[in-house]
From Swiss-Prot:
GTP binds at residues 15-22, 62-66, 124-127. Belongs to the TRAFAC class TrmE-Era-EngA-EngB-Septin-like GTPase superfamily. Era GTPase family. One of its GO terms (molecular function) is ribosomal small subunit binding. Residues 15-22 are annotated as: G1. Keywords: Cell membrane, Cytoplasm, GTP-binding, Membrane, Nucleotide-binding, Ribosome biogenesis, RNA-binding, rRNA-binding. Residues 124-127 are annotated as: G4. This is GTPase Era. PROSITE patterns: G_ERA, KH_TYPE_2. It comes from Buchnera aphidicola subsp. Acyrthosiphon pisum (strain 5A). It holds the Pfam family MMR_HSR1. GO terms for cellular component: cytosol; plasma membrane.
Length: 283
């Protein structure tokens, strides 16, 4: 019996904040493993998604949106993580927002092309472009930048758009043993998953009021056989003013955040959950 060759590689998704990287990852994997919102810098750390189809395993890394210093247009915050992550890549997916090419896109491109790793560029959110004729001159503009392996105009929200993308990715995966079992869709720990579920509700409920430095820390995570899950989490903010914003009038906001977070945790883990949230300031 002939043994099938196996293929496996890392695919890094990069781009400015809020271009749709997390939406793309979730739709490729077929499950929500990365939180999505309109707020910039929703993704604060690398999210790994794994897609195994037959003898192909693609390991996707959704990186935090690249942030720039307003004064000098230099990359900041996640710069070191950006460089370290690209070192393991088989392929880089560079996402841009429609035909809005900026100096920041130019800087990101200049950095990733130094890696000599094949780059596929995605023009995302084309469903928001009413006059599709303007796409062609923009694609020609991109072709003059570097020799991209492909330039794909898509809407990351539409799964039907992703068939061609996944086929291109498969063609670039090297012959390798699979790193993860077929059932794996992410390397995220349960602690991380719970903290992200809570943080997603903070983003949705607080919107522009959300302190950018907010952090969710899982203090305890205990499972009583298969009966119930007991979680205590701390929401860290910078000062008393931010603390009052998160708690809300008479504690109404934090109650709603806690209730919906608990429901979403129960749906994720298929177990009754008891969730206690504390809001603390670092002063």
């Amino acid at each position: 019996m002939k043994i099938k060759k196996k293929y496996c590689g890392h695919v890094i998704i990069v781009g400015k904040a809020n271009v749709g990287k997390s939406t793309l990852l979730n739709n490729i994997i077929g499950k929500k493993i990365s939180i999505v919102s309109r707020k910039k810098n929703t993704t604060q750390s690398n999210i790994t998604g794994i897609k195994t189809e037959d003898n192909y395993q693609s390991i996707y890394i959704d990186t935090p949106g690249v942030v720039f210093d307003k004064n000098n247009n230099q990359m900041k915050h996640h710069k070191n993580n950006f460089y370290q992550t690209t070192q393991i890549a088989t392929l880089i997916i560079f996402m841009i927002d429609r035909i809005d090419w900026t100096i920041h896109d130019e800087i990101i491109l200049n950095e990733i092309k130094k890696t000599k790793i094949p780059i596929l560029i995605i023009i995302n959110k084309i469903d928001k472009i009413s006059n599709k004729i303007i796409l062609l001159p923009f694609i020609n503009f991109l072709k003059k930048k570097i020799d991209f392996i492909e330039i794909l105009p898509i809407s990351a929200k539409k799964i039907s758009n992703l068939i061609l993308l996944k086929n291109i990715i498969k063609s670039y995966l090297p012959e390798n043993c699979h790193i993860y079992p077929e059932c794996y869709v992410t390397t995220n720990s349960d602690f991380f998953t719970v903290s992200e579920i809570i943080r997603e509700q903070l983003i949705l409920f607080l919107g522009d009021e959300l302190p950018s430095i907010i952090k969710v820390e899982i203090e305890s995570f205990k499972k009583k056989e298969k009966i119930a899950l007991y979680i205590k989490a701390i929401i860290w903010v910078k000062n008393v003013r931010q603390k009052s914003i998160v708690i809300g009038h008479n504690g109404e906001k934090i109650k709603k955040i806690s209730m919906i977070s608990r429901n979403n945790i129960e749906k994720k883990f298929y177990i009754k959950t008891h969730l206690v949230l504390w809001v603390k300031d670092k002063n």
